[in-house]
Amino acid sequence: MSAPKLLSLGCIFFPLLLFQQARAQFPRQCATVEALRSGMCCPDLSPVSGPGTDRCGSSSGRGRCEAVTADSRPHSPQYPHDGRDDREVWPLRFFNRTCHCNGNFSGHNCGTCRPGWRGAACDQRVLIVRRNLLDLSKEEKNHFVRALDMAKRTTHPLFVIATRRSEEILGPDGNTPQFENISIYNYFVWTHYYSVKKTFLGVGQESFGEVDFSHEGPAFLTWHRYHLLRLEKDMQEMLQEPSFSLPYWNFATGKNVCDICTDDLMGSRSNFDSTLISPNSVFSQWRVVCDSLEDYDTLGTLCNSTEDGPIRRNPAGNVARPMVQRLPEPQDVAQCLEVGLFDTPPFYSNSTNSFRNTVEGYSDPTGKYDPAVRSLHNLAHLFLNGTGGQTHLSPNDPIFVLLHTFTDAVFDEWLRRYNADISTFPLENAPIGHNRQYNMVPFWPPVTNTEMFVTAPDNLGYTYEIQWPSREFSVPEIIAIAVVGALLLVALIFGTASYLIRARRSMDEANQPLLTDQYQCYAEEYEKLQNPNQSVV
């Protein structure tokens, strides 16, 4: 496959423009015929003597243009179509050279800073706080809702998306790159869709659906962490508000109601259609993207910026599945955090004793795999019963953001408790896209799962204001504790009684005469010694 065709998508994916600021150059520079054909995406930062004179900010020592490093270790055998998907060995099907930034510099041209840093020299630490949406003031809640709506309606100043696969990225004439503008929030939706879409095998062939670069594997938590981080940074730039942070929804309430589904927050239920959002909420006006699955799967097209129908949501309304009519319990989170191994073979949705599979929701909260169970993250999605419960569409419902910030908070607490133990995050043989060093699809510049497997306050510039529930004892544990307690009580009573008996005996003995008929007198011994028939030694 020619370099230009491969490069197309890479440009579109400048979601990664790690923390790109509005004043910096847009990776759209790489969505040109020249860039696509060269396989190089190393834009200038501040060219003085013409194009190509300051690639990656090289003149100021910020970075340099280097070959892309991509993980080529083997993946698990469940994906049998090697060579058929643009996302394989990401991003080499699109770009083979990118900016490698020095120190705390980052971005597509090394013009910005790594997470947790800011300033002209990227030498100032920054820490923002993600808080519970329900704990925000009225003004803060309104600000967050307005910011989301603004992101939905604001064209992304930095990124464009590909609307065709790599083979067709330059258009029918081979000279027209197939990219589109898209809003900031819809870009957030698009990147998620692209990571979960089926593998197109050709017209007339059924697309392969047993592939997912962001779910059902070790990368689930790291991928969604970066996904949120990218949106948060984009919204900070949009608002020109560096301290803006994404709040979270603590969905572990055990209730059968959505406590954030009110018109002043994420929208209540419509009185006219129980599956729609109330017209009193701004989110009732939102329209979804990436819903043309039949075209994607049969024609090989990609999701574009076209918006379709409204968001559907009917919390606790799936009467056919009673198990998804109630949200997770607080104790489910407490139990999940006691699962000490990050992941276990086969590193998939049937892993047992895996923290990742537990918080993702394919195991019960104690870590035991059960094919009938949907818990925590999965249960919260299914509870919403609509757009938010369909993987390829779920980010269209803005509750997705809040649901995943809470999931990320659980992840960060696990990292803190277990010292970010990455030893059980596999280097190879995980599902495709989920190896430890794999570049997460479709972010650009490349960012690996490892880079997100760190505690957020120390490494990513944000922290959570949250109180974790302590684990309650189960009925069997309570019974066991009661039995042990009873045995200890019996032992204590027995020991006390024995002590009292011994003490009484000692007291009786103390009250007896010092010399009785039972004891010999020194006089008797003396008389024996005076007997001449006995020898004295």
UniProtKB/Swiss-Prot annotation:
Glycans are attached at residues 96, 104, 181, 304, 350, 385. It holds the Pfam family Tyrosinase. Keywords: Albinism, Copper, Disease variant, Disulfide bond, Glycoprotein, Melanin biosynthesis, Membrane, Metal-binding, Monooxygenase, Oxidoreductase, Signal, Transmembrane, Transmembrane helix, Zinc. Plays a role in melanin biosynthesis. Catalyzes the oxidation of 5,6-dihydroxyindole-2-carboxylic acid (DHICA) into indole-5,6-quinone-2-carboxylic acid in the presence of bound Cu(2+) ions, but not in the presence of Zn(2+). May regulate or influence the type of melanin synthesized. Also to a lower extent, capable of hydroxylating tyrosine and producing melanin. Residues 1-24 form the signal peptide. InterPro entries: Di-copper_centre_dom_sf (IPR008922), Tyrosinase/Hemocyanin (IPR050316), Tyrosinase_Cu-bd (IPR002227). Zn(2+) A binds at residues 192, 215, 224. GO terms for biological process: acetoacetic acid metabolic process; melanin biosynthetic process; melanocyte differentiation; melanosome organization; positive regulation of melanin biosynthetic process. The activity depends critically on the nature of the bound metal ion. Catalyzes the oxidation of 5,6-dihydroxyindole-2-carboxylic acid (DHICA) in the presence of bound Cu(2+) ions, but lacks activity in the presence of bound Zn(2+) ions. Zn(2+) B binds at residues 377, 381, 404. Its main location: membrane. Residues 25-477 are lumenal, melanosome. The chain crosses the membrane at residues 478-501. Belongs to the tyrosinase family. Monomer. Interacts with ATP7A. Interacts with SLC45A2. Glycosylated. It is an enzyme of class 1 (oxidoreductase). Its cofactor is Cu(2+); Zn(2+). The keyword Hydrolase does not apply. This is 5,6-dihydroxyindole-2-carboxylic acid oxidase. The gene is TYRP1. It is a single-pass type I membrane protein. Changing residue 93 to C: Associated with blond hair in individuals from the Solomon Islands; rare or absent outside of Oceania. Pigment cells. It is found in: Melanosome membrane.
